[in-house]
């Protein structure tokens, strides 16, 4: 799986275009989940996330970074850069909404998580559409990203594109297992961030009907 993934990335191509329109757009909230296979409390953190998302009607994007708590087979430098260098994070499990910090709060359950999301009804300044084509014979992935932005003075935006993989089965420490005299269990890791197509914190794009292309 790792070999296939690496080859796929080498052949990926991304193109982006955008145009200005006089409107705003419904917003999806970004949920960045920080976890580690070495963290025995992280399965409980996952339980709270799922309970919260099961009640949501607002569209969301969920990605999981394996970071902070040592390294495991899914840890990448970009995830640690976001968690520790940008957010100042020093423990997992942790959740960040729309990449903004909530200082001084200890979140312990799904109800508390819900109370922290204050931007669900905020309109977005841009829309994003992603299309892709995959050629299994050549392992080539073509990604096309298009969008519209609100007609306002701001003409430059940061565009972040990452690749995530769902349903990865691997080892996971679990506090419940330790009570049973075992350290590890087989665990399904969802929505794991595997790599960034753009720079970790996004590439600056200007929207005067321009197109951008990337090869990685």
Predicted regions and their residues:
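A generic structural signal for short, solvent-exposed coil/turn residues
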Residues: 10, 23, 31, 54, ...
């Amino acid at each position: 799986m790792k070999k296939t993934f690496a080859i796929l990335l080498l052949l990926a191509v991304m193109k982006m275009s955008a145009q200005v329109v006089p409107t705003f757009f419904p917003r999806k909230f970004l949920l960045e989940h920080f976890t580690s296979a070495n963290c025995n409390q992280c399965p409980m953190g996952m339980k709270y996330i799922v309970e919260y998302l099961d009640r949501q009607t607002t569209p969301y994007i969920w990605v999981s970074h394996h970071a902070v708590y040592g390294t495991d087979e899914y840890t990448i430098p970009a995830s640690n850069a976001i968690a520790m260098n940008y957010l100042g994070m020093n423990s997992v499990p942790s959740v960040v909404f729309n990449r903004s910090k909530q200082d001084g709060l200890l979140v312990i359950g799904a109800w508390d998580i819900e109370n922290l999301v204050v931007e669900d009804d905020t309109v977005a300044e841009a829309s994003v559409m992603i299309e892709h084509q995959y050629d299994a014979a050549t392992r080539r992935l073509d990604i096309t990203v298009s969008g519209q932005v609100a007609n306002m003075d701001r003409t430059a935006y940061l565009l972040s594109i990452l690749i995530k993989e769902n349903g990865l089965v691997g080892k996971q420490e679990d506090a419940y297992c330790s009570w049973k005299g075992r350290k590890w269990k087989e665990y399904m890791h969802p929505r794991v961030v595997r790599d960034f197509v753009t720079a970790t914190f996004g590439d600056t794009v200007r929207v005067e009907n321009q197109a951008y292309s990337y090869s990685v």
